Regions:
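Active-site recognition of the HExxH zinc-binding catalytic motif
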Residues: 63-76
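Metalloprotease/metallohydrolase-associated module, dominated by Zn2+-dependent proteases
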Residues: 1-60, 76-115
């Protein structure tokens, strides 16, 4: 298990009491994707996975991981599991993790409004 997958496990215990299934976390260059982080939904034979941009600081990677974990939480914890993108369920999970201020799809690197 790599460092960031272990970090996922730690944050899962801290914010979700370990309720989320552990998924693989990969750190790579996401410049071509134009993203800081990606959550891949489970589909057919593909398992869920999180990718984080390698060019971020450790602090930013941690917050991006939380952002993507909130997508995973909506997928696993909400009964209807609608395609949620950055909807109300996801925003609720972001606030649960300590993100404050305006919560939208661009929020991830920083938890506070100042960031």
């Amino acid at each position: 298990m790599n460092y960031w997958t272990k970090k996922f496990t730690h944050l899962n215990r801290k914010y979700w009491n370990g309720k989320l299934s552990t998924i693989k976390v990969v750190v790579r260059d996401l410049a071509k994707d134009g993203a800081e982080g990606l959550y891949h939904y489970p589909y057919e034979d593909e398992e869920a996975m999180i990718e984080i941009d390698k060019n971020l600081t450790h602090h930013e990677k941690t917050n991006i991981l939380l952002h993507e974990m909130c997508h995973h939480a909506v997928e696993e914890l909400y009964e209807d599991r609608p395609y949620h993108d950055h909807g109300s369920e996801w925003k609720k999970e972001m606030r649960k993790c300590g993100f404050i201020g305006r919560i939208n799809s661009k929020r991830g690197r920083y938890k506070t409004k100042a960031g």
